[in-house]
Structures are given as C-alpha cells and as structure tokens.
Amino acid sequence: MLEKTTRMNYLFDFYQSLLTQKQRSYMSLYYLDDLSLGEIAEEFDVSRQAVYDNIKRTEAMLEEYEEKLMLLHKFQARQQLVAELKQLINEEEHVNDKMKQVVEDIEKLD
C-alpha cells in the first residue's frame, strides 16, 4: 500500500497539471492530506462512491500518462545514474573537480 501511495504521489506531482481541478482536489486530499473517502465526500457534498470512482479513474489516467510520457521512469533513471556517479567519485581519490560540478548540475535539474 505504501508503495502505491508513493507512486501515486510521484505521478500526481509530475502530471497534476493535466488533471481537472476536481481531480486535483480529490487526489491531493486523498494522497497528500490523507483524508478518507468519507471526509472528502462530506467536504464536496457528494457520495463516498463518487469520490472513490473519481480517484480510481484519475489513478488510471495518471498511469496512462506515465505509460506514454515516462516522466517518472526517466526521473528514477536519472536519480540512479547520479547515485552511481557519486559513488564512483567518492571511491576515486583524485577525481577532477569539474566532474563533481557536473554531477551537482545534473542533480539541480530535478
């Protein structure tokens, strides 16, 4: 469950601008603010089922966006490469300072 929540938080972060205001609100309250379906339903004066359906549809949309655009995948790949570069730099005693700067610049991109 925690893995799914983390993934949805990342996907929401990358693709929220592609969602409607209602979808953003529901996802933000559910995943970021940790409100229950009932609490969200009460706030928007709709049924719990309506909130559930909207969140499930939005989750599917986010997964579809990721399948096509792969922003999360690319982000994770960059993070992995930066971690490997850092490890190599730390293992090598006389690494060029320029290489260290390049790694720092790559990290700033995210």
Curated annotation (Swiss-Prot):
Matching entries from InterPro entries are given as: RNA_pol_sigma_r3/r4-like, UPF0122, UPF0122_fam_protein, WH-like_DNA-bd_sf
Entry protein name? UPF0122 protein Bcer98_2498
- What NCBIfam families does UniProt report for this protein, alphabetically? PRK00118.1-4, PRK00118.1-6, YlxM
What is the stated purpose of this protein?
Answer: Might take part in the signal recognition particle (SRP) pathway. This is inferred from the conservation of its genetic proximity to ftsY/ffh. May be a regulatory protein.
Q: Which HAMAP family match?
A: UPF0122 (MF_00245)
Pfam families hit by this protein:
UPF0122
The family classification in the record reads:
Belongs to the UPF0122 family.
State the superkingdom: Bacteria
Annotated coiled-coil positions are none
